[in-house]
Amino acid sequence: MSDNDQQLRVSKIQNGTVIDHIAGGQALNVLAILGIDGTSGDSVSVAMNMPSDRLGHKDVVKVEGRELSQNEVDVLSLIAPAATINIIRDYEVVEKGRVERPSVVEGVLECPNHNCITTENEPVDSRFAVGDDGVRCEYCDTIIRDDLPAHILAE
């Protein structure tokens, strides 16, 4: 089988976003971050545990008709730090780049500390400092290391 045959296991998209080099097994978490649950009508292709020289195994997500916001890319970088984002228009890659981990994410994660000011009826957006081993709430210092997708705020 040629390299081209392997690359076309998932068909090309006309317009939208391709998220490549996601660590194997993380594609469903990427869909959760993007709020894609199958009910919105988004056309999505997912390839999981594909062979990868760089990662061993990788996942790929293709979303037709949608370009990611910077907030989405920032949160995505927390669970897929090696991901590459490709913007597709008329079947051509018009923009390509690796995700960059921000130093802070704001308003996209929910603090698990029930006593944190961001979880009460206060008009305060959550704010987390991004570290190498997790994220830390800047209000109560609670650290989230595991299951980050479970703490994503619904839009």
From Swiss-Prot:
UniProt keyword annotations, A-Z: Metal-binding, Pyrimidine biosynthesis, Zinc
Q: One biological-process term from Gene Ontology?
A: 'de novo' pyrimidine nucleobase biosynthetic process
Q: Which Pfam families match?
A: PyrI (PF01948), PyrI_C (PF02748)
Checking SUPFAM superfamilies in the record gives: Aspartate carbamoyltransferase, Regulatory-chain, C-terminal domain, Aspartate carbamoyltransferase, Regulatory-chain, N-terminal domain
What does the UniProt record say this protein does?
Involved in allosteric regulation of aspartate carbamoyltransferase.
Q: How does it assemble?
A: Contains catalytic and regulatory chains.
Give the protein name, as stated in the record.
Aspartate carbamoyltransferase regulatory chain
Record the organism: Haloarcula marismortui (strain ATCC 43049 / DSM 3752 / JCM 8966 / VKM B-1809) (Halobacterium marismortui)
Q: What does UniProt list as this organism's lineage?
A: Archaea, Methanobacteriati, Methanobacteriota, Stenosarchaea group, Halobacteria
Encoding gene (name): pyrI
